[in-house]
Every structure is written in C-alpha cells, then in structure tokens.
Curated annotation (Swiss-Prot):
Assembly, per entry: Component of the eIF4F complex, which composition varies with external and internal environmental conditions. It is composed of at least eIF4A, eIF4E and eIF4G.
Residue ranges of domain Helicase ATP-binding in the record: 56-226
Protein name: ATP-dependent RNA helicase eIF4A
Molecular functions per Gene Ontology: ATP binding; ATP hydrolysis activity; RNA binding; RNA helicase activity; translation initiation factor activity
Keyword Phosphoprotein: no
GO biological process, one term: cytoplasmic translational initiation
Top EC category: hydrolase
Organism: Sclerotinia sclerotiorum (strain ATCC 18683 / 1980 / Ss-1) (White mold)
Enzyme Commission (EC) number: 3.6.4.13
Motif (Q motif): 25-53
Domain Helicase C-terminal: from-to ranges: 237-398
Organism lineage: Eukaryota, Fungi, Dikarya, Ascomycota, Pezizomycotina
C-alpha cells in the first residue's frame, strides 16, 4: 500500500501540486455500468463537477488518489460513483470501506451511496458510534458491499471480526484533515494495518497539513494528486434588482417589456425547471426574440454547441436551468435574469456571482411574486446583500 512519494516534498502552504490533468466532462463517456449511470442521472446529476471530471477516472482505473477540494464541490459523489463502479454486487462481502470524521457525515455518505446505487442491488451500512453494537454486528454479518463509518466504531468491528477485510479493494478517507485533527490518527493507522496489502487508497481533504501528508506517504503508492482550487465567487460589483410581478402569468409580459427597454449584449435567463425553460423558449421565439435554451435533457454535444454559440456571441440570450449555472462561464454576460428565484439560496451566487479576480460588472434582475418575497429576504440575509427595486433608468446601468 505504500512507498514514500517523492513529489510531496514540493508542497507549499498546505496545498498539493496536481500531477494529473485529464478531464472527462460528461458521465456518458466514463464507461460506467448502465445501472450506475441510470442512478447518477436519477439522483439529479447532469454534468460532472470539476472534481468529478478529474478524479472519478483515475480512481476507477485503480490508482491511489489524493484529492484536495472544499466541501460542496461534489466530492462525496466522486468516490461514491467510483466505489459503485468497481465493486461486484454479486459478492456479499465488504469491498469498500469509507471513513468519515462525524456520524452525520457518515450517514450522509451512506444516503448518497444508496441513492446512486439504487438500481444496482448493493447494500451500504453505516457503522457509527452512538448506535447499538448488536445491530451493527447483525448488519455486518449480512455482508454489505460498502461500509461507511467513523474510525472508532469501524476499528472496533474489524477487531471483533464482524467487519471482515479480506475482500476489501478500496479504502476511502473523506475529510482526512478533520479526522486527524479529531484525534483519530491511531485508529486510522491501525485500520490500515488490518487491510489487505493490495487495497487501493483514496484520500480527500480540504487542507493538507503535515499529519495528512504523513498518511499519504506511509500508506499510498505513487498517488495521483488532484487539486481543485476553490472558485471564489463574489457579488461585488453586481447591481441586484427585483421587479415585483403581481402573478406568475405576468412574468412573460414583464420580460418582453424589459427586452424593449434594454439593449442586451448578452444575457442568461434562469428558470427552475426544464419544462419551464422549454416553455419560455417557445413563447419568446413566438414573439420573435432570438434565444437559445440549455438544460440536462439535451445530450452533451448539443449543450457544447449551444455554449460555443453563446460564447462566440452568435446567440445572445441563453435560457437555462440551475444545474447548469455552475457550468456556465458567464464572464462576458452583462445581465442575468432570474425568471424564477432559485429554489435554494446557495444557487443564487452560482447564477449571478463572478470570479473575484475578473471584477466584471453586471446586473441581476429578479422577478419576484408575492410568494417569492420570503425567499428574496432569505437570499439578502444569507449573502448580507441588498436587492433593490429596479429603477426606471435601468438601461443606463447595463
């Protein structure tokens, strides 16, 4: 499992240096089992996030992998998809062990594995402190293919021989920095000693302090290193407005009026559902507006083509769903319209935020019905920002 990795000496400021740059930007081209791919899409994923594009393939190929990424980047699904791809559902023994620093995170990971593996006939058991030891023993004797747990309870179950390690192929450490800082180092080292020599190790961590690097040096063989830098999104420099719309049905006319008032160089309009995107595209096209639409029902080829046209400026208005907000590089977009306010406030910054280093100016206009007022207030509070009523001279601001 281990030989000292020379490359780790280059580390500065707790950041690893990537040594692997291949990316795969669609789930369809990862050669996943059909029933796993079905689970990925059923879970709501449309397109792999940055870490998923880079880390899933090396893990599936069997490399030891160190991935440095913040939470919220899609790392749970990264190792869940990889684990599910590699295990044999017909073998009723633990083939993958996932460690997490807290019970809550372990349970959350279990839910993701179960949901994505929904069509695969795979069992995943959460082995965590604070629950009945007897229940754990019983569940482990049934031979779940994936066990996710906290170091203390997992170590206990391996020592008592209820969690058998002889069929284990993969060992995943999630939030390794957290686990080590919580004093689990000894138990983690003990677990390593009890695993087969050939076990593949995958380690995920937001930071890379010395104790995490020691684990990688001791227990990982020539690891692939992937650093996903945190994209700092900011609302600075973006003027945010709302237009009060009395009822949902009036939004379309409001949008048409806005078109008349404003010369739009490029705009993205966000709706909350794919159906709404298609509906709005049809309505605007019928009113002789040129728009393109993009959502997850389209295949990757179509989406790439639409993005290319949009980036080159040959299409000026793009109507899209949230799931693509993170994938759209809207640096050149002067206007973002939230036809629907996002269903969760985190997506607001992905729709209208900009990479701070670009410092581009922009305008965001939110269509707000009476039902949306509460959500808008929540967004303002969450981001400590102000969304003001749109002034008459909005055209001068864009």
């Amino acid at each position: 499992m281990a030989s000292a990795d020379k490359g780790l000496e280059e580390i500065q400021e707790g950041q690893i240096e990537s040594n692997y740059d291949e990316t795969v930007d669609s789930f369809d081209t990862m050669n996943l089992k059909p029933e796993l791919l079905r689970g990925v899409y059923a879970y709501g994923f449309e397109r792999p996030s940055a870490i998923q594009q880079r880390a899933i393939m090396p893990v599936i190929k069997g490399h030891d992998v160190i991935a440095q990424a913040q939470s919220g980047t899609g790392k749970t699904a990264t190792f869940s998809i990889s684990v599910l791809q590699k295990l044999d559902p017909n073998v009723k023994q633990c083939q993958a062990l996932i460690l997490a620093p807290t019970r809550e995170l372990a349970q959350q990971i279990q839910k993701v594995v179960v949901a994505i593996g929904d069509f695969m006939n795979v069992e995943c058991h959460a082995c965590i402190g604070g629950t009945s030891v007897r229940d754990d023993m019983k569940a482990l004797q049934d031979g779940p293919q994936v066990v996710v747990g906290t170091p203390g309870r997992v170590h206990d179950m391996i020592q008592r021989r209820f969690l058998k390690t002889d069929s284990m192929k993969m060992f995943v450490l999630d939030e390794a920095d957290e686990m080590l800082s919580r004093g689990f180092t000894e138990q983690i080292y003990d677990i390593f000693q009890l695993l087969p020599q050939s076990t593949q190790v995958v380690l995920l961590s937001a930071t890379m302090p010395q104790d995490v690097l020691e684990v990688t040096t001791k227990f990982m063989r020539d690891p692939v290193r992937i650093l996903v830098k945190k994209a700092e999104l900011t609302l600075e420099g973006i003027k945010q407005f709302y237009i009060a719309v009395e009822k949902e049905d009036w939004k379309l006319d409001t949008l048409s009026d806005l078109y008349e008032t404003v010369t739009i160089t490029q705009a993205v309009i966000f709706c909350n559902t794919r159906r709404k995107v298609d509906w709005l595209t049809d309505k605007l096209t019928a009113r002789d507006f040129t728009v393109s639409a993009m959502h997850g029902d389209m295949d990757q080829g179509q989406r790439d083509l639409i993005m290319k046209e949009f980036r080159s400026g040959s299409s000026r208005v793009l109507i899209a769903t949230d799931l693509l907000a993170r994938g759209i590089d809207v640096q050149q977009v002067s206007l973002v319209i939230n036809y629907d306010l996002p269903a969760n406030r985190e997506n607001y910054i992905h729709r209208i935020g900009r990479g701070g280093r670009f410092g581009r100016k922009g305008v965001a206009i939110n269509f707000v019905t009476a039902e949306d007022v509460r959500m808008m207030r929540e967004i303002e509070q969450f981001y400590s920002t102000q969304i003001e009523e749109m002034p008459m001279n909005v055209a001068d601001l864009i």
